[in-house]
Amino acid sequence: MKTLQTSPKKDGYRMPGEFEAHKDVYLLWPERPDNWREGAKPAQATFAKVAETIAQFESVTVGVSDRQYTNARHMLADNIQVVEMSNNDSWIRDCGPTFVVNDKGDSRGVDWTFNAWGGLVDGLYFPWDKDDRVAQKVCEIEGRDRYRLDDLVLEGGSTHVDGEGTLLVTEECLLSDGRNPQLSKEQIESILKEYLNVEKIIWLKKGIYLDETNGHVDNIANFVKPGQVVLAWTDDQSDPQYAISKENYDMLINETDAKGRKLQVEKLYLPKPILITEAESQGVDTVDGTLPRLAGDRLAASYVNYYTANGGIVFPLFNDPMDEKAQEILQKLYPDRKIVGVPAREILLGGGNIHCITQQIPAGR
């Protein structure tokens, strides 16, 4: 593995849409007791189910710490590869590499700086040094060269692309004080265009209400395919989420993509607000410097936080009446893919969902 001093744009590489073909997908194994309740045992069972479900469609590799290797190997199916990989927590979408591809089928990793969603300003835990090495380790395992950005803090969940030159982000996240206060919006845009090789960036204002990542785009909007966007939605005008989604909807329906197409926007309805219970809160260790999980706190539940696999969609279930409607909408949006729901409250309790715990490797070399 080489660390390259050029850029994807200069080298003819682009970030593909998640709906394009994958070689495999990576997850990290949860274990920290100050984020996952009951010593992470319920979360581990859920992660194992997500991995097993995705393995119906593509190869799966799970990175685990030395402490958890034997346990994870026991809990995960035999067709899932388990590798030792130290980490601070299990959000590989955000700390893992963003892969870019060229027209010959070659791929490389982009290794952004990771600081736990805000560093010492409003980050969610400290330290995060092991997480910041995950992207390099994945590139090493995969035999892919990488681009390393020491001067830009970015998480994979804060970007979605259509593979044809258009990028979706939120101002709430990318312009937050804890990430890149030294850079202007225009400077951030210039770096993203260079390292994702996109031509147009659509800046939504905010993400899901109370999303602790400062409003990652992958929880509120996604490209189904070029020219078509799915958006998290509620009809409840008394919910703070309504104004956020409405502003994003009004922006998107009046936008064009990099190819000049008007965007088709599909609404994916949210479940009713989900709150942490007293029992769930008491199961999480209290540690200074880590975001507490308090009873009554509203969680950032969204069906948009799904994973697009080869031939399948793996989406979160919340034991809510909207689960069934989400399945119907996703089936309409992806008629050629199998739609599979996985009960995902345990991931939600940790601060994210299925898309947040996955990182795909594009097909090719």
Curated annotation (Swiss-Prot):
EC identifiers of the protein: 3.5.3.12
Signal peptide annotation: none
Keywords of the record: Hydrolase
Keyword field contains Iron-sulfur: no
GO function terms (MF aspect): agmatine deiminase activity; protein-arginine deiminase activity
GO BP annotations listed: putrescine biosynthetic process
Record bears the keyword Amino-acid biosynthesis: no
Pfam families documented for this protein: PAD_porph
Superkingdom, natural source: Bacteria
Catalytic activity: agmatine + H2O = N-carbamoylputrescine + NH4(+)
Gene3D superfamilies, sorted: L-arginine/glycine Amidinotransferase, Chain A
InterPro entries the UniProt entry points to: Agmatine_deiminase (IPR017754), Peptidyl-Arg-deiminase_porph (IPR007466)
Top-rank EC class of the record's enzyme: hydrolase
Family assignment from sequence similarity: Belongs to the agmatine deiminase family.
Protein name: Putative agmatine deiminase
Species this protein is from: Latilactobacillus sakei subsp. sakei (strain 23K)
